[in-house]
Amino acid sequence: MSESRIDFRKAEFLISAPDIAHLNEYLPGDVGVEIAFAGRSNAGKSSALNLLTEQKIARTSKTPGRTQLINVFKLDKHRRLVDLPGYGFAQVPLALKLKWQQALGEYLLKRDCLSGVVVLMDIRHPLKDLDMQMIEWAVESHIPVLALLTKADKLGQSDRMKMVNEVRKKLSNFDDAVKVEPFSSLKGIGKSKVLSILDGWCKPEWLMQQIEADAIAAAQAEAGKE
């Protein structure tokens, strides 16, 4: 069964939750497909979500660490985007910082419907310890990762590709589990490439088969009414 490209502009706010335990209370079970966005508090995560959905769906802040909640956005009845709390911020109490990092780890390791994780990193300062931890958690759970090097407009074309290649080399031990792409919310660099990757993550074979089966069942039920 074929399906047209997912329209990420249709994303709409669903719920907010302080941690994965509360998230499970609100979501309709661990079902469907979720794509998570994670990154350091200054990596430009909210700006990236706003560009990809072409709306101000995620709140941006000049204060690192302000986004403390897990925010969930619905694409359709089968698919969701999940904006995870920023990590690595300095002006936050250690206990709260550790609590958030634990919640991120639990989400990545326990959420079966996760179809992909976008780890956003400032292209000028990639692969910090917590970035690597996020990537390793996802790979450990057999979840594909897109390492998105944000603020790519801050570098010239030559330096930009040099950094992309360096990061790809450092992550090469993960084989095909991790893709690396440059991105700029300001200039739109990498937008179409990212949307293509996300579109693929939204269409795992099992979900496409389920959608087809549901369509057939609905058609048969409708025919039975005639």
UniProtKB/Swiss-Prot annotation:
Cofactor(s), by name: Mg(2+)
Keywords for the protein's UniProt record, in alphabetical order: Cell cycle, Cell division, GTP-binding, Magnesium, Metal-binding, Nucleotide-binding, Septation
Residues binding GTP: 39-46, 65-69, 83-86, 150-153, 183-185
Pfam families: MMR_HSR1 (PF01926)
Residues involved in Mg(2+) binding: 46, 67
Domain called EngB-type G: residue spans: 31-204
GO cellular component: cytosol
GO MF annotations in UniProt: GTP binding; metal ion binding
Taxonomic superkingdom: Bacteria
BP term (GO), one: division septum assembly
Function text: Necessary for normal cell division and for the maintenance of normal septation.
Family stated for the protein in its record: Belongs to the TRAFAC class TrmE-Era-EngA-EngB-Septin-like GTPase superfamily. EngB GTPase family.
Name of the protein this chain belongs to: Probable GTP-binding protein EngB
